[in-house]
């Protein structure tokens, strides 16, 4: 164990192959000397023993291949590898004689009872690690051997080499067996059971080269599953192979199975049913009654399928999933059927409404009470009803006309009577209108006043300006008045009065013409701008 502890993952130490080859040579030399010394009878006995041991090893290999195949199907390949690598390498480092002894001890110590299944599952043999070596090439050329992954068929060379080694070991002398197995006796018992439990390869060639991919829990489970018995498939012990004849060996050839298992045939039937169902769901609205018939047929088919499943005894999970699928499909079909029926009813109702078109107003006639009428006789009551019906029809006909007006035009001779408040407002309005007309007439009759023309106003302005420039005394007096007056408005009034007085004096006698002019205004008249 310790001498191979430092081997890295992915590398192979080939030292044990050389030791294998040397041990094989020793065994061959011993067997040659023994064959020369033995009698012909002893040689015949040894040959029969070799044949029996070969057949025993073949049967164990066949059982191991079948059990390994089942375990490869059950267990996924993803498991930690490190602990198993060291164990398998350490167990494979023993010489060939010790390995043969180990196999014999394991098979004698443990009865192998393999339960033959009713049906063989489909096995995909991809990526099986098949390692084979050649001892002669390693001793002559010193080349390194590489692990090669091949399918299960080319591994017959490895089986033949293993059988030759086992034959050589069994034909060797007892001294070589005792000397080779004494050093590894305890390791055979301990490591043999571990290698037997951890072996999940499809054949015994994994003892030579393979690295198992099982955790310790799975090793324990696989060891337990080997002990499950079936009375028709018990095998003889390895130690008793030389004593029994070839006729007592149990035939372990694989049973003939049909091309399609019951589970696969049922799955094919379900797939076909699903295809038919998808096609029919495309036009459900047109095939409602066909869907009803399909539901009946499907229910019959599902019942028959359930009976077939009970006969074939499939797994519980497949039963549950199929029952759930069937119930879901049935519910889905019922839902689709109800939806299509509702849609069809709605479409029919809409079509009937469209056919009827716009309906006219229809007034329900009140039902005549059968009670006795004391105020009118029966003939009078009937006449009143007829008149009422006639009037009702007339009113309905006028209501249907768009431009009809039932309003009676009022006569223009009689105006509407007004209230006293409206009359007072009307009188006030008339008075205001009369006053406005009088003011308008007075404004239109007014003529323009004398001296209000623009030319006359300009002439007056120029005269006033010339007078102010020619008489500085008046300007000085005006300034003194402005200084002593407390208010500015008083100076304005004084200057205005003085100007008016001067103007009046000048206008009294015109020097150019000499004729006296008309006096415009007396001096006590107020000016317009004051």
UniProtKB/Swiss-Prot annotation:
Keyword Aminoacyl-tRNA synthetase included in the entry's annotation: no
Coiled-coil residues are 372-447
Ranges of biased composition (kind: Polar residues)? 50-63, 227-236, 491-501
Q: Where is the composition biased (Low complexity)?
A: 170-203
Instruction: Identify the stretch(es) annotated as Disordered.
Output: 29-83, 116-258, 395-417, 483-530
| InterPro entries (alphabetical) | Cfap97/Hemingway, Hmw/CFAP97
Name of this protein:
Cilia- and flagella-associated protein 97
Family named by the database record: Belongs to the CFAP97 family.
Q: Which organism is it from?
A: Pongo abelii (Sumatran orangutan)
* Compositional bias segments (type: Basic and acidic residues): 35-49, 67-82
Biological-process GO terms, alphabetical: spermatogenesis
Phosphoserine found at: 19, 138-139, 215, 245, 327
Acidic residues bias (residue ranges): 129-139
User: Positions modified as Phosphothreonine?
Assistant: 133
Identify the stretch annotated as signal peptide in this record. Answer: none
The protein's gene is named CFAP97
Provide the alphabetized UniProt keywords: Coiled coil, Phosphoprotein
The record's Pfam families line, in alphabetical order, gives: Hmw_CFAP97
């Amino acid at each position: 164990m310790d001498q191979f502890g430092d081997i890295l993952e992915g590398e192979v130490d080939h030292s044990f192959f050389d030791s294998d080859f040397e041990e094989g040579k020793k065994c061959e030399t011993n067997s040659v000397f023994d064959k020369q010394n033995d009698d012909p009878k002893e040689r015949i006995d040894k040959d029969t023993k070799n044949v029996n041991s070969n057949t025993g090893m073949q049967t164990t290999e066949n059982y191991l291949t079948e059990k390994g195949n089942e375990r490869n199907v059950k267990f996924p390949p993803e498991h930690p590898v490190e602990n198993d690598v060291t164990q398998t390498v350490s167990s494979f480092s023993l010489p060939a004689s010790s390995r043969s002894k180990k196999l014999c001890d394991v098979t004698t110590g443990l009865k192998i009872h393999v339960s033959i299944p009713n049906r063989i599952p489909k096995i995909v043999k991809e990526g099986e690690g098949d390692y084979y070596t050649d001892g002669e090439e390693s001793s002559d050329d010193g080349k390194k051997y590489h692990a090669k992954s091949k399918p299960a068929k080319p591994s017959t060379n490895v089986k033949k080499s293993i059988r030759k080694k086992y034959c050589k070991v069994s034909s060797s002398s007892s001294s070589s067996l005792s000397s080779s197995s004494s050093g590894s006796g305890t390791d055979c018992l301990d490591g043999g059971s571990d290698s037997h439990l951890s072996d999940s390869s499809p054949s015994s060639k994994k003892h030579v080269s393979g690295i198992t991919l099982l955790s310790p829990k799975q090793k324990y489970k696989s060891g337990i599953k080997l002990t499950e018995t079936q009375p028709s498939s018990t095998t003889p012990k390895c130690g008793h192979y030389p004593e029994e004849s070839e006729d007592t060996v149990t035939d372990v050839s694989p049973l003939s199975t049909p091309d399609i298992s019951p589970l696969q045939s049922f799955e094919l039937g379900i797939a076909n049913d699903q295809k038919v169902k998808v096609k029919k769901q495309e036009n459900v609205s047109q095939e409602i009654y066909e869907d009803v018939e399909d539901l009946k047929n499907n229910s019959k088919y599902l019942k028959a399928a359930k009976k077939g499943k009970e006969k074939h005894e499939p797994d519980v999970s497949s039963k549950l999933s199929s029952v759930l699928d069937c119930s879901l499909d049935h519910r889905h079909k019922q839902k689709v059927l109800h939806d299509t029926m509702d849609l069809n009813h709605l479409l029919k109702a809409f079509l009937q409404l469209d056919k009827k078109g716009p309906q006219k107003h229809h007034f329900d006639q009140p039902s005549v009470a059968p009670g006795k009428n004391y105020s009118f006789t029966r003939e009078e009551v009937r006449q009143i009803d007829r008149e009422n019906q006639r009037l009702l029809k007339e009113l309905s006909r006028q209501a249907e006309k768009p431009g009809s007006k039932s309003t009676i035009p009022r006569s223009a001779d009689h105006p509407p009577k007004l209230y006293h408040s409206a009359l007072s407002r009307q009188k006030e309005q008339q008075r205001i209108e009369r006053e406005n007309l009088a003011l308008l007439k007075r404004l239109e009759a007014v003529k323009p006043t004398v001296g209000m023309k623009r030319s006359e106003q300009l002439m007056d302005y120029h005269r006033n300006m010339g007078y102010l420039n020619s008489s500085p005394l008046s300007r000085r007096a005006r300034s003194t008045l402005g200084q002593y007056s407390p208010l500015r408005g008083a100076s304005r009034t004084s200057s205005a009065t003085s100007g008016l007085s001067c103007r009046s004096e000048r206008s009294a006698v015109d020097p150019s013409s000499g004729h006296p002019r008309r006096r415009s205004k007396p001096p006590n008249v107020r000016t317009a701008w004051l």
